Amino acid sequence: MIKVGIIGYGTIGKRIADAVAMQDDMKVVGVLKVTPDYEAKIALARGFPIYTYSDRFDKFKKAGIEPAGTIEDLIKASDIIIDASPEDVGRENKEKYYQRYDKPVIFQGGEEADVADVSFNALANYEEAKGRRYVRVVSCNTTGITRVLTSLILNGIGIKKARIFIARRGADPKEHKKGPINDVVPNPATVPSHHGPDVQTILKDIDIVTMAIAVPVTIMHMHMAYIELSSTYTKDAVIEAFVKTPRIFLADVGSGFQSLAHVIEYARDLGRSRSDFPEVAIFRDSVTIRGNELYLMYGVHQESIVVPENVDAIRAVLGILPKWRSIEKTDKTLKLITEGKVYG
């Protein structure tokens, strides 16, 4: 049983904790919280011991929460650490704490790529993480792009270049201090956005350029992709690649999927925790072939898409299971859509 310590219990950390707890080959030995808020109390109710920094003990005790120990104690109690801290805090934790202990650490995409030995996506480069000390699961948008491109590559569809245009959600649903509210913001105004170079930390030979804007929504990101293929392929061949690839969902307008809100409503109707949708939601009707050019649109649920990647990263780093067995195990335990998917 792999003992997993989780540093940070926010949007990503709490989802990873729940996902790890659903596996039969790993368990959560504790989560690190900085603030004794409602999330800390929910973590306790879920059976996760709460750790914090030594100078925060009194605040937790006053809130009725008895800390199980310090961050150092949590690291010592763990076989592997998932760092789900806010952007740039992971690097600080590495320099201040992780380097003192011989424990592997998995960072998130908010950190720069050089915080880790390898950037990770389960479909694309699972094997590269084996035995690595520091691994970084790439961001939500990078994960979405990498999945889509890898689904083509795995099914023998060559890619000459990819141009991806991203409409980023302005904030997560709970982020009351972020925006925009009534604006469309170049994010950034320069080209490329960081997503293209980030994809290249995994798919190193891919010719890719990305552009991004931030829009006043909270539910999901939307990507609009132009992909030049290495040869002429039929639309059916491309659709079949998406159908077979795990963690990709094809949304049909005729079935009621007319917007990203319908994807989230579908997640709610499935009874998924927190209305999560870790799959990339490709609008089937948008998939268009013109010669060797492929066009498509797809949604990325920023709060949950990286969760299965973190579970697989744990097994990849520790060499517990080979790639496809881990991906299938994760998908089934998290109750992702597995019908028609090919694992191997």
Curated annotation (Swiss-Prot):
Involved pathway(s): Carbohydrate degradation; glycolysis; pyruvate from D-glyceraldehyde 3-phosphate: step 1/5
Record keywords, A-Z: Cytoplasm, Glycolysis, NAD, NADP, Oxidoreductase
MF-aspect GO terms: 4-hydroxy-tetrahydrodipicolinate reductase; glyceraldehyde-3-phosphate dehydrogenase (NAD+) (phosphorylating) activity; glyceraldehyde-3-phosphate dehydrogenase (NADP+) (phosphorylating) activity; NAD binding; NADP binding
Binding site for D-glyceraldehyde 3-phosphate: 139-141, 195-196
Top-level taxon of the source organism: Archaea
InterPro entries tied to this protein: DapB_N, GlycerAld/Erythrose_P_DH, GlycerAld_3-P_DH_AS, GlycerAld_3-P_DH_cat, GlycerAld_3-P_DH_NAD(P)-bd, Glyceraldehyde-3-P_DH_2_arc, NAD(P)-bd_dom_sf
EC number per UniProt: 1.2.1.59
GO terms for cellular component: cytoplasm
Signal peptide as annotated in the record: none
Catalytic activity: D-glyceraldehyde 3-phosphate + phosphate + NADP(+) = (2R)-3-phospho-glyceroyl phosphate + NADPH + H(+); D-glyceraldehyde 3-phosphate + phosphate + NAD(+) = (2R)-3-phospho-glyceroyl phosphate + NADH + H(+)
CDD domains tied to this protein: GAPDH_II_C, GAPDH_II_N
SMART domains per UniProt: Gp_dh_N
Subcellular location: Cytoplasm
Residues that hold NAD(+) according to the record: 11-12, 110, 169, 302
Residue ranges of the TM segments: none
Class of this enzyme: oxidoreductase
Catalytic residue list: 140
Main location: cytoplasm
GO biological process, one term: lysine biosynthetic process via diaminopimelate
Description of how the protein assembles with itself and partners: Homotetramer.
Similarity comment text for this entry: Belongs to the glyceraldehyde-3-phosphate dehydrogenase family.
Name the record gives this protein: Glyceraldehyde-3-phosphate dehydrogenase
Origin species: Pyrobaculum islandicum (strain DSM 4184 / JCM 9189 / GEO3)
